[in-house]
Amino acid sequence: MKRTFQPSVLKRARTHGFRARMATKNGRQVLARRRAKGRKSLSA
């Protein structure tokens, strides 16, 4: 059986990266929440 997690830096950045978050309204809400919580890292 193949493992489901096959890491790829590019895929990770495209789906969970800062620019991907900024592209949608909800993504911006995610960033706002993480800023409010005081997260050291906002996105992948």
Curated annotation (Swiss-Prot):
GO MF term set: structural constituent of ribosome
GO CC term, one of those recorded: ribosome
Keyword Ribosomal protein listed: yes
Record-linked InterPro entries: Ribosomal_bL34, Ribosomal_bL34_CS
Residue ranges, compositional bias (Basic residues): 31-44
Keywords in alphabetical order: Ribonucleoprotein, Ribosomal protein
Source organism, top-level taxon: Bacteria
Region (Disordered): 23-44
An example Gene Ontology biological process: translation
Membrane-crossing segments per the record: none
Family of this protein: Belongs to the bacterial ribosomal protein bL34 family.
PANTHER family xrefs: LARGE RIBOSOMAL SUBUNIT PROTEIN BL34M, MITOCHONDRIAL RIBOSOMAL PROTEIN 34 FAMILY MEMBER
Protein name: Large ribosomal subunit protein bL34
Gene: rpmH
